[in-house]
Amino acid sequence: MKVSIFKTLYFQVLTAITIGVLLGHFYPEIGAQMKPLGDGFVKLIKMIIAPVIFCTVVTGIAGMESMKAVGRTGAIALLYFEIVSTLALLIGLVVVNVAQPGVGMNIDPATLDAKAVALYAEQASQQGIIPFLLDIIPGSVVGAFASGNILQVLLFAVLFGFALHRLGEKGQLIFNVIESFSRVIFGVINMIMRLAPLGAFGAMAFTIGKYGVGSLVQLGQLILCFYLTCILFVVLVLGTIAKFNGFNIFKFIRYIKEELLIVLGTSSSESVLPRMLDKMENAGCKKSVVGLVIPTGYSFNLDGTSIYLTMAAVFIAQATNTHMDIMHQVTLLVVLLLSSKGAAGVTGSGFIVLAATISAVGHLPLAGLALILGIDRFMSEARALTNLVGNGVATIVVAKWCKQLDNDQLQAVLSNKVLPNVKNSVSVS
């Protein structure tokens, strides 16, 4: 039975975003007051992320025949993340040097309002590779779940999964309980996702209502340059990776179109993390691979954020006439290879990492962040969308390299064909 287009999440979210843009543009004061709708939806999603990751990772690892396979999957995923993230950083660096969107602005850093970025600078001072690594270890298991720290929950879930696997038959009862709990959790997700159009409407109405479409004009060159770079990265880089691994990037984008629209409305790739876990498993990737790659990718494989970081940093240098030679840019790249791993898939984290990077490099004026602050919210959509597509592609590629991919199921799903063993648990229509 064919579902009416009006009942699909895709249509509902697209309609909600359109209404949000119109409300924010024509009635900005009312639009700005819609922020709680977007915030509330994202909070509902965050509420469920920790248990989803725990259940997915534990059942995935405990259900595997060999523990060596888990270690191999993790190693391959991290290698992939590092290579592709580095490519994203390099592409952002090359494009911003060629396009030079900041040249000619001739802004004196002394005239910029440093107070506007003081909070971000303070948060950035706490960034660093050692604190980041130590922060992965939770002070307590309860604290990890309470704060919703993805990497902390992931670490505990991996250890729990290993321990449960070692118990063998003795741990079967616990395994069954967690698997049943997982089904309940995904039922809760389906209920929450019915509110996605409302969340997308609120977030978009607030963005347009508060900042206005006109605020994009002055710094439009950077925004346009960034969006085009993200599109080129997805089509050329991720498209090439997809082609060499046996699937079409455009078919994959069509497959996750509902998730992309939700991310477009909320500006946070984290808002669809639970659905992506389910959809990637539905696409033929084994649960153990999905449970490791997707959550880890939210900190280690943020392609859109990587592009943004190099472009924004060099843009500030160009706009303030701060000279950056080859060595300065190489230093920037090296620092970003480390600092970019501290970003999470949530709105605003990329800006904090940018502040941390500029502080660490020392050559760029920190006050220059004020130039980016006003348009950062408009760039977050492209960041989040690119991050989402990048993590989806990474999951399929790692699953294939680890021989944990059902290619027939993948091709059937991407071609809109239904196999008897394909579950359709992601439908919320």
From Swiss-Prot:
Sorted alphabetically, the keyword list is: Cell inner membrane, Cell membrane, Membrane, Symport, Transmembrane, Transmembrane helix, Transport
Gene Ontology MF terms: fumarate transmembrane transporter activity; malate:proton symporter activity; succinate transmembrane transporter activity
A GO cellular component annotated for this chain's UniProt record is: plasma membrane
The protein's matches in InterPro entries, at most eight in alphabetical order, are given as: C4_dicarb_transport, Na-dicarboxylate_symporter, Na-dicarboxylate_symporter_CS, Na:dicarbo_symporter_sf
Task: Say which domain of life the source belongs to.
Answer: Bacteria
Does the entry feature the keyword Iron, yes or no? no
- Transmembrane spans: 3-23, 44-64, 76-96, 144-164, 184-204, 222-242, 331-351, 352-372
**Protein location:** Cell inner membrane
Where mainly located?
A: membrane
Q: Which Pfam families does its entry note?
A: SDF
Give a short account of what the protein does.
Responsible for the transport of dicarboxylates such as succinate, fumarate, and malate from the periplasm across the membrane.
PANTHER family xref list:
AEROBIC C4-DICARBOXYLATE TRANSPORT PROTEIN, PROTON/GLUTAMATE-ASPARTATE SYMPORTER
Protein name per Swiss-Prot or TrEMBL: C4-dicarboxylate transport protein
